[in-house]
């Protein structure tokens, strides 16, 4: 019985010493206004990221950066990109630049960069697969009897 009581005391003492006392609660749980701000920031980041990734030419925009792909210490990774003037993309890219500059979200820039790199990698892989599949299909059409160009078979002449 004494051992059980001793174990209970040690468990209670251990929980108090090693439990919540060493790991303080996150600030957002203590301050509801901060939790609201974190939620709004998360929504803003998701919106901007999805909007940027929805552009078909986002890979061109990222590739057009001067100084290589690793020089994004300035923050906005698409600073030097100018979309074609015939579309509304110029206005939208300007809007994104304005949002990024206003919020000064320095830690969000690497998130955008990594997402764009991943999207461009997937897009490149899909294009490579599509090209490979079209080449394979072309070979099948050429060399198989079910399609494509075939050389005409010589007529079979009867033996006399």
From Swiss-Prot:
It comes from the Eukaryota. Residues 1-19 form the signal peptide. The keyword Transferase does not apply. It is found in: Secreted. Acts through intracellular calcium in Malpighian tubule stellate cells to raise chloride conductance. Residues 20-130, 151-160 form a propeptide. Keywords: Amidation, Cleavage on pair of basic residues, Neuropeptide, Secreted, Signal. It comes from Drosophila melanogaster. The modification Glycine amide is found at residue 147. This is Leucokinin. GO terms for biological process: body fluid secretion; G protein-coupled receptor signaling pathway; negative regulation of feeding behavior; neuropeptide signaling pathway; positive regulation of cytosolic calcium ion concentration. GO terms for cellular component: extracellular space. GO terms for molecular function: diuretic hormone activity; hormone activity; neuropeptide hormone activity; receptor ligand activity.
């Amino acid at each position: 019985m004494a051992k059980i009581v001793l174990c209970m005391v040690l468990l209670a003492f251990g929980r108090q010493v090693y439990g919540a006392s060493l790991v303080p609660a996150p600030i957002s749980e203590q301050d509801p206004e901060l939790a609201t701000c974190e939620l709004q920031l998360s929504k803003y980041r998701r919106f901007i990221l999805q909007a940027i990734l929805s552009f078909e030419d986002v890979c061109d925009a990222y590739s057009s950066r001067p100084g290589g792909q690793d020089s994004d210490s300035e923050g906005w990774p698409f600073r030097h990109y100018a979309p074609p003037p015939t579309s509304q993309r110029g206005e939208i890219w300007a809007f994104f630049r304005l949002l990024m500059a206003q919020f000064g979200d320095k830690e969000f820039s690497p998130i955008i960069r990594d997402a764009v790199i991943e999207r461009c990698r997937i897009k490149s892989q899909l294009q490579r697969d599509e090209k490979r599949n079209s080449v394979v299909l072309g070979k099948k059409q050429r060399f198989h009897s079910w399609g494509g160009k075939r050389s005409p078979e010589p007529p079979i002449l009867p033996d006399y």
